Amino acid sequence: MTAWSLHELWKTSHSTLFQVTLATVLMAPVLGDCGPPPSLPFASPISQLDEVSFPPGAVLKYTCHHGFKRTNSSHITCDENGSWVYTTFCARKRCKNPGELVNGKIEILSDLLVGLNIEFSCSEGYLLIGSATSRCEVQGKGVNWSDSLPECVIATCEPPPVINNGKHSGREEDLYTYGSMVIYSCDPSYTLFGNASIVCTVVNKTVGVWSPHPPACEKIVCHQPQIPKGELVPGFRHFHTYKDALEIRCKKGFALRGNSVIHCEANGEWFPSVPTCEPNGCIDIPDISYASWDGNRFPLENTAVFEIGTKLKYRCKPGYRANVHDVQIVTCQENLTWSSPSGCERVCCPTPNMEKIKIVSERRDFTGTCVYAYGDYVFYICSEGTYPMTTDGRSSCQADGKWDPAIPSCEADPSLQNHFALTFPNISETNVTNRTYLLENENATESFIKAVCPKPEIINGNLSVEKEIYAEMENITIQCDSGYDLVGSSNIICLENRTWYPDIPFCIMEGPEDCEIVNKGRQLLQCLSSPEDVQRALEVYKLSLEIERLEQQREKRTSVHRKAHYTKVDGPFRPFS
């Protein structure tokens, strides 16, 4: 090969050849050499090398790091491309099997090679005493585990908690091992809330605790619910305890609104809420003034419930009549209300013709719209100069709107111009002369006489007006002393026949203290020893009352027919013969 000087090369005319030659000269030392040897994770060169460039084919020997062992030829070679070529020739050493962990387990994450960890854990209910991990590491010329096997010991709990108003089934022990269970119970009349049993468990794999929390014993009372128109199953009890159940039923005519079964809850309340019994028909019988219910087998009650479509018939009380001619019926309608009744109106009696009669006394009910209504009565006399009446001077307004007896018309008497005679039918003159009369207005031009009545003798009572004699048509009121009851009318009037009407009442003691003062059979049952005696006594008493009533009627008929004519005189009174 001919050597060329650089000057000569520049002078050549072959520029292309020059460029190729120059590149070859410059690249010759780079393409064939290897750089410094690589730093391997498992091995390093046997000796320290100072060279930074190695020719192709150069071989370097390596030695394995601690914890690794040689598995193949431990050298690297520089190839023609200037790269170090090698295969993995060192492998990690392996620690021995750690063995078996009693009541636990060992978790090998990947292998037992150097640098790797294993983990320890205990079985449920056991606590780990020692390290939870161990690492395979180099120790001297070999490898071993960084930590020895731990120990798994069974967990323990303190004695179970004591609760108020209750107890548990555990024995008197200082410690309870994992899995131990105790059962709680409450004292009588107390209810257990929570879990009755608790168990010794482990928390965070470090400590033994009782789980769940112990229960509590409380006294829970639910009061007996009050459900109008409802019935309870089971029957009546003042109190109910937790979780007691009640079934509610409604009485006939009422429908249940709500749940039929309720339970006593921990807060002392019923759940669901207590239902109600609502009417399933019409209630509250219509209040029809002056009417009574008719055609019903049993007395009607406001508390009864009537089904839809029920018809009730009513009738007006004596002295009243229907406002209209409609049927006197009310009906229970679909909306659970009664149809509107037509009602009753008062029956009125006509006002007496006052032209020739004079009303001297009356009893009237001034609260109504009638001048005279059913039950009212009047006392009357004929005006002066007219015929005397043929009745007893008293008439009552009846339920049909008529007076009974009918009020007569008094006719003028032409024979009585300047006087009128005094006569008593069916009474002898001798008897007449023995009667007492009162001369009215003795000094007047026209004088009249009136019959007088003697003072009534009321034992244990008093009169509204105290006098020895009372004039005809004069009213008095009788009132009994304290502790006595009035038998008869409290108001009486003096009639022209010198008798009191109605009969003079009397006062009797309110209640007998013993059998000696029993009045007319009152408290008779206390005085007789057998029912037969009582029956006979009542029959005798009834018979005596009938006799007394007949005598009074006979006396009344006799007094009614005693009528008198009075003589107009100019001086002292004298009866005509």
From Swiss-Prot:
Statement: the UniProt record of this protein carries the keyword Transferase: no
Main location per the UniProt record: cytoplasm
Designated name of the protein: Zona pellucida sperm-binding protein 3 receptor
Entry GO CC: acrosomal lumen; acrosomal matrix; extracellular space; plasma membrane
Coiled coil: none
Keywords: Cytoplasmic vesicle, Disulfide bond, Fertilization, Glycoprotein, Repeat, Signal, Sushi
UniProt-listed CDD domains: CCP (cd00033)
GO biological process, one term: negative regulation of complement activation, classical pathway
